[in-house]
């Protein structure tokens, strides 16, 4: 599964790439960009299965990115990353079809495997259902 990371916080973006054992769970990080506009440019030129995106970003935020991709790239799935623990953000993201909503505040390195396993299972079950 090819993954794109989208976050305006460079340290968070690079840290997420480094801290997770992506390959163990069948993921390959194919890129990381700093905002939704850059994400759209990347998606138009590279195959991606799942986008891990922050919500609050300049230009195009994570929820807007989800909406725009739903029209242009309906096969791409999303995982939302956010410092907001506000339930309404999570609820909106899930209603829009996000595979998961991960709080950056309560996120710990110990959870990485659990998160990737959960996302992988959800993604693969959706792909299996659509076949």
What kind of feature is each model-predicted range?
Residues 32-41, 62:
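Helix N-cap/capping motif at the beta->alpha junctions
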Residues 57:
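Receiver (REC) domain active-site loop signature in two-component systems and cognate sites
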Residues 86, 91-94, 98-131:
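Interdomain helical linkers/hinges and coiled-coil/dimerization scaffolds
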Residues 7, 54:
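Active-site residues of response regulator receiver
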